Swiss-Prot record:
UniProt function note: Cleaves the beta-phosphate at the 5-position of soluble inositol pyrophosphates. Has highest activity on 5-diphosphoinositol 1,2,3,4,6-pentakisphosphate (5-InsP(7)), 1,5-bis-diphosphoinositol 2,3,4,6-tetrakisphosphate (1,5-InsP(8)) and 3,5-InsP(8). Possesses phosphotyrosine phosphatase activity in vitro. Dephosphorylates the phosphoinositides PI(3,5)P2. Hydrolyzes para-nitrophenyl phosphate and O-methylfluorescein phosphate in vitro.
CDD domains: PFA-DSP_Siw14 (cd14528)
Annotated site location: Transition state stabilizer: R118
Residues in the signal sequence: none
Record flagged with keyword Nucleus: yes
Keywords tagged on the record: Hydrolase, Nucleus
Lineage of origin: Eukaryota, Viridiplantae, Streptophyta, Embryophyta, Tracheophyta
Name of the protein in its database record: Inositol diphosphatase DSP3
Length: 203
């Protein structure tokens, strides 16, 4: 994948996105693990939150960046081992989805180590909530995972039960707002949505 790099006119910094960076939809982004050289680019996204899908502690340098920019960190420790393979924990993915679909956390970045498998599973489950057809969901996962896509990830996405998520988030719904074309957006009722508790946040 080719990195897009440009110059920030305000301070002359070179803006380099994290590996495998892309927009999922308005206000939702995905990538591999951000490095210090990516911080200037991340600042342009005006992030409110980051979903981190690895069990390892977040680097101190990254935590300082989050604190300086008032970004909340939600950590959901999902093992990425392949030998032996670690099953994707449904309850953990469900908890991460609750954070992801709450617009009060947007703009939000999802990342794991490489932004392919754990991130791809979470985005795939989001697409099912958005009522994407399964073939398109799996195609998106494979496109982002490249040659290293995993059949067990596809099986997890296919089997993921979105009914349980919808039952937990009755007050969150999708509405369409048209500006020449219809755009999907999340809405919520403030009094009915419980604020998820960050597992690691320094804000």
């Amino acid at each position: 994948m080719c990195l897009i790099m440009e110059t920030d006119d305000h301070n002359g910094d070179v803006l380099a996105p994290p590996s495998n960076f892309s927009m999922v939809e308005d206000g939702i982004y995905r990538s591999g693990f951000p490095r210090p050289e990516n911080f200037s680019f991340l600042k342009t996204l005006n992030l409110r939150s980051i979903i981190y899908l690895c069990p390892e502690p977040y680097p101190e340098e990254n935590l300082k960046f989050l604190e300086a920019n008032n970004i909340k960190l939600y950590q959901f420790g999902i093992e990425g081992k392949t030998d032996p393979p670690t099953p994707m924990p449904k309850d953990t993915v469900l908890d991460a989805l609750k954070v992801l679909v709450d617009v009060r956390n947007h703009p939000i970045l999802i990342h794991c180590k490489r932004g392919k498998h754990r991130t791809g599973c979470l985005v795939g489950c989001l697409r099912k909530v958005q009522s994407w057809c399964l073939s398109s969901v799996l195609e998106e996962y494979q496109k982002n995972a490249g040659l290293k896509w995993r059949q067990r990830d596809l099986n997890f996405i296919e089997a993921f039960d979105i009914v349980s998520l919808r039952q937990c988030l009755l007050s969150i719904m999708y509405q369409y707002h048209g500006y020449g074309f219809k755009r999907r957006r999340l809405a919520y009722e403030e009094e009915n949505v419980k604020t998820p508790k960050p597992q690691a946040a320094r804000v």
